[in-house]
């Protein structure tokens, strides 16, 4: 096992490995003298390296020994820097051949020290100088006589402790001695007789469990308040961050602006909390000044609001409670029994599993912990890592004796035990723990980020065959189990947030400074002396009042730099030369800085880790291929552009950009990639999606679809993705989430999702997948069969339109499924039953559906801890058996329920559902720790809530158009909403691929003309968003709206009582429908139906092929206005068509009709006739008598079009469609004779007198408008004069001219 970078050995281990590999590196050809010099240097370093290891294992080294170790560590860093400077000037090109950095012109900036290759003689002389320094250090070691030090048995241990797959052992989560304090504190906070805002403070020494108690009470009570927040302060709190955290929790989905000041945050909090019942927890208050600032943000009202604080100083506690000592809850240490119980749980699992010979010493050690839970946890973590040998345990007991005196000081006991726990850590764990001093006190850290930083720093030592990330994870959980790191929150997907207890933080800050490992500087500190030559440096300059630029620090040697604060305090990147880790989190100020240029990072050739978080736009360099060691690139900010050569970063492991970013084509070239977040299916090319199949090392794939060009494109991209993911044999996690802007797949509403047919996207996901999250953005028609084949699945989150019992059975057998989240769009007809032994290891279950019908049999979900439910209350529904068998969930700890309201449901219905649910839980789950039931507006179903969302969007758009949202616009909002829903419902009657013309919508009466906008233009606007075909002027003539309304239209058909689906049972129940599709109907079906109110049947092949069925429907349907017979099975018109006195629109497109019956000309109400793509070549002469015919659509077969242009008295406008000429003119005419036209701008002008003469003749002959669509006639030369003749009318500007025919 190679030695990693460590605080005790410096860079000695990596340096020796580097010197060992240099002479044989294929990309560097070294002359023999230089190879010999490198070999001699390595031998010298190995000698002093061995002495350094010996000294690092001494318990209490002398001052002289410390001085020598510091010198050798610095020397190892210095030599590695020199080696990197001399030999890291080359980077691989596209073809893998070595090229100089100058060839790439990185950033077009000259790089000092790297501009040209050093001569071999120069490098040989430099190696000789380094050898001289090493020999001097070796001589001082002999002169100081440092070879007699004795190694510590504890600190010399290199034993590594691993935990199973990143899980904190179950005993770590067991709480001891909390029941009684929790009950008392809860009673203090829930006294409803005290209406005024009340403050309760938990007082106790460090490590006694104040935070744990506050968290338990907070989780229990928070749902009883309108809003709530839990934040942690510190001894040097960042007030802006603290107040921003409160505001973001009480006012969800708010984004704190960079320009927000402390006072503006206080004002926003004060305003938002007015007249609200709030519950705020402020943990770890140290100063009254901090409390004075925070409390000014909370209005003192009579809404029973509560604030809970924790403090270790009695004066601070009294100040918080306005010196009402009765509101101070004083915590007392654990008794010996509780301390022993906690100890045994942590070490052995229970006291019964403790070896007999260790029982007595265990009680002795526990008694010396002073009843402090943190002390017990740390000492238990120490002993759990040691062999169960009596002598070792008694040695630990002996070390604790000095901590216990007759006058017990709990703070000193805790410090002593923390110090003992630290001293007994292996060196590799000490290094990782000390690295946390890079962050400020109380900072919440994402574990995933921390592990990647450890790896980039070189702290992780791996043995052949081990995965470096798994080893890093084992380091982390080892420190958690030892109590050195605290897990703040573990999300359902196993993402962990962590921090460090302030007492532990004090220790690692002290040790880090002592070892010159990390220098952390904040605005309140003077510049420490050891920061001048720091290798790892962090700045915390978030206070706008005191933050200033730092001077006097040399940055060229800094290897790791973390910056948190105002952008103006950020040092120039040009000053860094050897950075390996760069962490930037900055914000602007009131001066309006909008962007930050980090193009100079292309100089940092040793960079391994780069993370930038900001609301400011980041300008990346145009090229970064010179960063050949870069492993993590994470930009949590908007960027101007992605470097085009990012695909050439051969060492890149983790790539993160915000959603919506278009990655350069060829992303599959980064074969080393393990994490890709986010890959946008909407903006990336299909070729780039295919290239994902080349990322054979990919483990975590985060997908989004922020802005697809169309719903069809999104579906097509999903199919492409599914066909290539099977090649990713190492894939463990697939997550699909909507982008920040949502996924706009419809012109009508926002972010519904992609409707996915499971047969079309049959998954080729590898069996290695452990996490699959496909939430409501991707909706399956049914649960895909292939999900049951993913036997290693750990987390599953998906949405399906419909769920049946067999689907649950296929999931119940997954052996490793721990997290299951399901969103069911269509309410099941039968109760969902979870059978005995179903989901044996499931711990988290979330189920969202319009109705709550489920039952748990005995033995189902035996290990379930958290249950989240969401459903809608319905009008008049009874909830006697709302959760059948919930008493069988014996390990359930937390329940969260959201109760919405279905259509027509009242508040009383939601209250009834809530009362029934609480009663069921109270009766059967007395042991429950956390119950959260809340009434919400609506739980998303297939139709109801989407409808409301669309309605809100319409109202907002009208308000925006008018500049406000005053009441005078309510009529307009209502009118627009009504028209929209009619068109949506009309779409829902038809199948997905059915196309509708704008004339059909006008004939239905859904779209009417208004001033300056005729009905046809209004219809064109409605169907504009989903075009299928265009007319000559580029206007949409037909559309497929159903394809873009997978959620709304089908349910709108039923809920608006507008049409009916193919579900015969529903149709018979409603018995009132205006529009009707028919599929596989039989004679017996039709006999059950009443067609009296039918207005628009859509008759498919099953009916049109049988004339007697068609006659059965049409006879007696006097209200039919639209009739679609456009099916190839129609060879003649049914005789019953003459029984339709109100028919306005007749569609015969695609039929086999050879001629039109004279019956049609006897129907004076017809306004639209579509005979395109039929075999009809001649039109009946009687068609000239159809006075109301305004739309006639014909094809090439109608050869007698010229006759109608000359003879048809009602012709007001002729339009010829042509793919070549694309000419069309549409007119407006009414019964008053008003007429105007719009013409193509390219129309050639003619003589004005001729135009006037033609116009007068035109108006004299015709009084109404007709639009004739012909797909082939416009290509004939004979039609050119007629087209120009019509176009010329536009120049006449005809209005109020002419009269009745």
UniProtKB/Swiss-Prot annotation:
Q: In which ranges do the LRR repeats occur?
A: 604-627, 629-649, 650-671, 673-697, 728-751, 790-813, 861-885, 1020-1043, 1060-1083, 1117-1140, 1141-1163, 1164-1186
Segment Disordered: which positions? 1214-1249
Mind telling me which Gene3D superfamilies this protein's record contains? 1.20.5.4130, Helical domain of apoptotic protease-activating factors, P-loop containing nucleotide triphosphate hydrolases, Ribonuclease Inhibitor, Winged helix-like DNA-binding domain superfamily/Winged helix DNA-binding domain
Q: What ranges does the record list as Acidic residues composition bias?
A: 1216-1234
**Alphabetically, which GO biological process terms does the record hold?**
defense response to other organism
Which keywords, in A-to-Z order, does the entry hold? Answer: ATP-binding, Coiled coil, Leucine-rich repeat, Nucleotide-binding, Plant defense, Repeat
Task: Name the Gene Ontology molecular function terms of this record.
Answer: ADP binding; ATP binding
Domain NB-ARC, first and last residues per copy:
181-464
Using the record for this protein, list the coiled-coil segments as residue ranges, or answer none. none
Keyword Cell cycle on entry:
no
UniProt-listed InterPro entries: Apaf_helical, Disease_R_plants, LRR_dom_sf, LRR_R13L4/SHOC2-like, NB-ARC, P-loop_NTPase, Rx_N, WH-like_DNA-bd_sf
Q: Which Pfam families match?
A: LRR_14, NB-ARC, Rx_N, WH_DRP
Tell me the function of this protein.
Probable disease resistance protein. Resistance proteins guard the plant against pathogens that contain an appropriate avirulence protein via an indirect interaction with this avirulence protein. That triggers a defense system including the hypersensitive response, which restricts the pathogen growth. At the opposite of cultivars Aichi asahi and Sasanishiki, the cultivars Nipponbare, Mokoto and Hitomebore don't recognize the effector avirulence protein AVR-Pia from M.oryzae.
> What is the official name of this protein in its record?
Disease resistance protein RGA5
Query: Which source organism?
Result: Oryza sativa subsp. japonica (Rice)
Q: Which gene encodes it?
A: RGA5
């Amino acid at each position: 096992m190679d030695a990693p970078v460590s605080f005790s050995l410096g860079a000695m281990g990596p340096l020796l490995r580097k010197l060992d590999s240099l002479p044989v590196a294929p990309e560097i050809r070294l002359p023999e003298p230089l190879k010999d010099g490198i070999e001699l240097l390595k031998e010298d370093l190995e000698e002093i390296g061995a002495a350094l290891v010996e000294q690092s294992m001494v318990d209490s080294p002398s001052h002289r020994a410390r001085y020598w170790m510091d010198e050798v560590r610095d020397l190892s860093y210095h030599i590695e820097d020199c080696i990197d400077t001399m030999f890291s000037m080359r980077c691989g090109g596209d073809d893998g051949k070595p090229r100089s950095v100058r060839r790439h012109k990185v950033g077009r900036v000259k790089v000092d020290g790297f501009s040209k290759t050093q001569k071999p003689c120069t490098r040989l002389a430099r190696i000789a100088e380094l050898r001289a320094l090493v020999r001097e250090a070796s001589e001082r070691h002999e002169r100081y006589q440092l070879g007699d030090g004795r190694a510590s048995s504890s600190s010399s241990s290199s034993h590594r402790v691993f935990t199973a797959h990143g899980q904190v052992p179950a005993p770590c989560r067991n709480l001891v001695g909390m029941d009684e304090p929790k009950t008392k504190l809860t009673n203090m906070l829930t006294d409803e007789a005290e209406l005024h805002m009340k403050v309760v403070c938990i007082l106790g020494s460090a490590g006694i469990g104040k935070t744990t108690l506050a968290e338990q009470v907070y989780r229990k009570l928070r749902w009883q308040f309108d809003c709530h927040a839990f934040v942690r302060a510190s001894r040097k709190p960042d007030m802006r961050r603290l107040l921003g955290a409160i505001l973001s929790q009480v006012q969800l989905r708010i984004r704190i602006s960079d320009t927000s000041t402390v006072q503006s945050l206080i004002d926003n909090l004060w305003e938002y909390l007015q007249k609200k019942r709030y519950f705020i927890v402020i943990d770890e208050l140290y100063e009254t000044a901090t409390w004075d600032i925070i409390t000014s943000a909370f209005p003192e009202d009579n809404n029973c609001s509560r604030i809970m604080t924790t403090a270790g100083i009695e004066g601070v506690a009294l100040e918080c409670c306005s010196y009402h000592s009765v509101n101070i809850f004083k915590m007392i240490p654990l008794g010996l029994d509780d301390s022993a119980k906690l100890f045994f749980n942590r070490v052995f699992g229970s006291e019964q599993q403790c070896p007999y010979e260790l029982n007595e010493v265990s009680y002795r050690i526990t008694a010396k912990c002073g009843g402090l839970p943190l002390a017990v946890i740390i000492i238990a973590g120490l002993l759990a890592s040691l062999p169960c040998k009596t002598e070792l345990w008694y040695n630990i007991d002996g070390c604790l004796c000095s901590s216990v005196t007759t006058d017990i000081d709990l703070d000193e006991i805790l410090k002593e035990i923390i110090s003992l726990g630290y001293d007994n850590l292996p060196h590799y764990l000490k290094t990782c723990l000390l690295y946390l001093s890079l962050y400020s006190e109380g900072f919440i850290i994402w574990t995933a980020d921390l592990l990647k930083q450890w790896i980039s720093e070189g702290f992780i030592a791996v043995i052949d065959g081990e995965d470096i990330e798994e080893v890093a994870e084992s380091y982390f959980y080892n420190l958690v189990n030892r109590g050195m790191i605290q897990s703040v929150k573990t999300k359902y997907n196993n993402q962990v947030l962590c921090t460090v207890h302030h007492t532990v933080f004090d220790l690692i800050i002290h040790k880090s400074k002592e070892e010159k490992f990390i220098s952390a500087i904040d605005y309140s500190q003077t510049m420490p002396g050891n920061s001048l030559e720091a290798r790892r440096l962090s700045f915390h300059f978030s206070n706008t009042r005191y933050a200033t630029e730092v001077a006097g620090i040399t940055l060229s040697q800094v290897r790791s730099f973390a910056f948190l604060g105002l952008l103006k305090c950020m040092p120039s990147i040009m000053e860094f030369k050897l950075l390996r880790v760069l962490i930037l989190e900055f914000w602007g100020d009131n001066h309006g800085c909008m962007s930050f240029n980090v193009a100079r990072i292309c100089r940092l050739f040793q960079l391994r880790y780069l993370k930038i978080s900001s609301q400011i736009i980041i300008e990346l360099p145009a090229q970064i291929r010179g960063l050949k060691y870069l492993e993590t690139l994470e930009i949590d900010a908007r960027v101007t552009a992605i470097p085009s050569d990012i695909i050439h970063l051969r060492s890149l492991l983790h790539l993160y950009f915000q959603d919506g970013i278009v990655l350069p084509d060829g992303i599959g070239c980064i074969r080393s990639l393990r994490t890709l977040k986010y890959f946008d299916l909407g903006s990336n090319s299909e070729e780039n999606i295919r290239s994902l199949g080349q990322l054979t090392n990919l483990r975590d794939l985060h997908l989004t679809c922020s802005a697809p060009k169309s719903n069809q494109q999104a579906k097509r991209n999903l199919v492409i993705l599914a066909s290539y993911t099977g090649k990713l044999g190492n894939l463990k996690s697939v997550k699909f989430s909507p982008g920040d802007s949502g996924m706009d797949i419809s012109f009508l509403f926002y972010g519904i999702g992609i409707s996915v047919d499971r047969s079309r996207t049959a998954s080729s996901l590898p069996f290695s997948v452990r996490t699959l999250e496909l939430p409501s953005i991707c909706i399956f028609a049914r649960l895909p069969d292939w999900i049951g084949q993913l036997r290693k699945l750990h987390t599953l989150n998906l949405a399906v339109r419909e769920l049946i019992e067999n689907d649950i059975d296929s999931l119940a057998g997954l052996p490793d499924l721990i997290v299951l989240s399901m969103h069911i769009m269509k309410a099941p007809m039968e109760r969902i039953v979870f059978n005995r032994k179903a989901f044996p290891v499931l711990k988290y279950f979330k189920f969202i559906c319009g109705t709550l019908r489920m039952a748990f049999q005995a033995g189902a979900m035996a290990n379930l801890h958290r249950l989240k439910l969401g459903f809608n209350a319905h009008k008049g529904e009874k909830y006697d058996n709302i959760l059948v068998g919930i008493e069988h969930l014996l390990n359930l700890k937390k329940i969260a329920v959201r109760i919405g309201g279905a259509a027509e449901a009242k508040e009383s219905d939601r209250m009834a559902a809530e009362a029934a649910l609480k009663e069921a839980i109270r009766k059967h789950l007395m042991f429950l720790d956390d119950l959260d039931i809340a009434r919400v507006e609506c739980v998303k179903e297939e139709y109801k809530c989407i409808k409301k969302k669309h309605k809100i969007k319409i109202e907002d758009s009208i308000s925006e158009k008018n500049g406000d949202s005053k009441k005078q616009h309510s009529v307009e909002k209502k009118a627009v909403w009504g028209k929209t829903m009619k068109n949506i419902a009309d779409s829902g009657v038809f199948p997905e691929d059915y196309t509708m013309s704008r004339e059909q919508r006008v004939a239905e009466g859904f779209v009417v003309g208004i001033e300056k906008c005729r009905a046809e233009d209004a219809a064109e606007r409605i169907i504009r968003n989903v075009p299928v075909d265009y007319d000559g002027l580029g206007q949409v003539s037909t559309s497929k709206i159903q394809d873009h309304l997978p959620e709304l239209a089908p349910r709108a058909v039923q809920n608006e009582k507008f049409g009916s689906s193919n579900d015969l049972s529903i149709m018979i129940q409603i018995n009132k429908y205006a529009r009707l599709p028919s599929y596989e109907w039989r004679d017996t079906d039709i006999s059950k139906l009443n067609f009296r109110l039918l207005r628009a049947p859509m008759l498919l092949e099953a009916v049109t092929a049988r004339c007697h069925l068609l006659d059965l429907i049409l006879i007696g349907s006097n209200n039919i206005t639209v009739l679609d017979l456009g099916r190839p099975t129609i060879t003649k018109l049914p005789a019953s068509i003459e029984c339709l006195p109100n028919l306005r629109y007749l569609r015969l497109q695609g039929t086999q009709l050879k001629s039109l019956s004279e019956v049609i000309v006897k129907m004076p109400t017809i306004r639209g006739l579509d005979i395109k793509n039929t075999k009809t070549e001649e039109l009946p002469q009687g068609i000239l008598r159809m006075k109301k015919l305004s739309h006639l659509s014909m094809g090439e077969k109608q050869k007698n079009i010229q006759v109608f242009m000359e003879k048809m008295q009602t012709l007001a406008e002729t339009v010829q469609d042509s793919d070549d000429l694309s000419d069309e003119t549409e007119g407006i005419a009414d019964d008053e004779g008003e007429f105007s036209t719009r013409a193509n701008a390219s129309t050639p002008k003619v003589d004005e007198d001729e135009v006037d003469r033609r116009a007068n003749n035109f108006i004299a002959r015709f009084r109404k408008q007709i639009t004739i669509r012909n797909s082939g006639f416009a290509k004939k030369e004979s039609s050119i004069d007629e087209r120009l003749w019509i176009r010329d009318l536009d120049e006449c500007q005809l209005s109020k001219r002419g009269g009745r025919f």
